[in-house]
């Protein structure tokens, strides 16, 4: 078992204190804890479990259930393609393959330089705007080969998401009242 650096322990204890060491706050605690190192190492899960008085298996189960929580190292750009039936019918598999080829990465892996990881999630909540993906938690819908080419270039340039074309991050509200 690895030992956590004292700065990480201090940050975790701060998060736990803000949530009053309440086990009912586990998901929020994990989300905030992940921001410390960009993922949730085993030692972090153990520390949280002990502090909340929960079995480690329960904490690990919650961390493993949500696709936006990472129990393995991920790239600085974390790309999650939606893998639901709608996105499959709209051709997401070809787009995922195209992005991976352009970034020289295999799906489910982290690039050698740690820049990017690409994988899938069961749903992004955007099947009305698919194919869709999340990049560092930001939704991008209506993917096309042109957009994938440009996204690959933006990632290679290490451009901050706030500087990406605004229309890429624009999600239309298709909910209508009668």
What does each of the following model-derived ranges do?
Residues 1-178:
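Feature of Fe-S/electron-transfer and energy-metabolism proteins
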């Amino acid at each position: 078992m690895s030992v956590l650096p004292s700065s990480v322990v201090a940050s975790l204890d701060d998060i736990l204190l803000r949530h009053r060491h309440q086990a009912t706050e586990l998901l929020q605690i994990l989300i905030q804890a992940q921001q410390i190192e960009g993922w949730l190492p085993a030692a972090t899960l153990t520390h949280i479990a002990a502090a909340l008085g929960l079995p480690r298996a329960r904490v690990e189960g919650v961390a493993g259930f949500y696709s936006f929580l990472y129990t393995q190292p991920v790239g600085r750009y974390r790309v999650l393609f939606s893998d639901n039936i709608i996105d499959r019918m709209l051709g997401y598999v070809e787009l995922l393959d195209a992005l991976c080829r352009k970034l020289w990465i295999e799906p489910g892996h982290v690039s050698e330089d740690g820049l990017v990881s690409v994988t899938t999630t069961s749903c992004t909540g955007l099947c009305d705007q698919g194919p869709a993906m999340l990049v560092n938690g930001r939704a991008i819908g209506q993917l096309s080969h042109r957009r994938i080419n440009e996204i690959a270039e933006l990632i290679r340039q290490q451009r901050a998401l706030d500087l990406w074309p605004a229309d890429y991050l624009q999600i239309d509200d298709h909910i209508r009242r009668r």
